[in-house]
Amino acid sequence: EFEKEFNENPLTKHVILLHELKKTKYSKDIIKHLAELNIEKGSEVLAAKLATNVGRYDYSIQVSKKASYEKRFYNKFNYPIINTPRVLKGKSMPSQEIILAITRQESEFDPKANSYAGAKGMMQLMTYTAKLVAKQMDVTYSKRKLTSDPEYNINLGTYYFNSLLNDYAEVYPFAIAAYNAGPKRVRQWRRLNGDPSKNKIDYVNWIELIKFEETRNYVQRVLENMNVYKYMLSQKPVKLEKFFN
């Protein structure tokens, strides 16, 4: 049986050993190699499962994403599900699917992710944003914990996104764009391109008119992720009119 052969492969054992030594960053290429061993017999799924088991959701996503380009879909591994806070400081937080959608796009669930711009951890928080949000939440700010404590990072990121959603009256495309490009730019784009929340333009066209390619792509991908998660969490079809919220 191929699964037995896969599990007994010295490279699979090497990945598990690296996990035990807390050195999983060295297992990325091994997992990608294992994924290619025998696709017909399920090496991609087994490699994605292995990545998940050693806590590397990012490698699991990368293997699954590559497979999806060739019409092989492993949503369980391509869209990991972790707990997100429902209530923080007595306030209701945004739905699980939007926080998962942002986290997948920001870091592929890599708790140690660091961007060239200085954004940190699972939800890619800039240090000045994290400091501000920690103060609002009345918790101690710790730069180290942004990349060493996933729960700390997700709590701060969720609280921050919730404040953006409140600022934009629960209009998801605005809040998502602001999370990526900053609230100031979203105010500018609403002024220049029209405001879909006031029926001046529809959401699809408003997103297409976002000046920055990175932010435009970001909003599209997060909304896409959100709707996949919506389906995965509810197991019910997502209605088109609910696509943007």
Where are these regions (language model features)?
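Catalytic glycan-binding domains that act on GlcNAc-containing polysaccharides
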Residues: F2-E5, H14, L21, Y26-N245
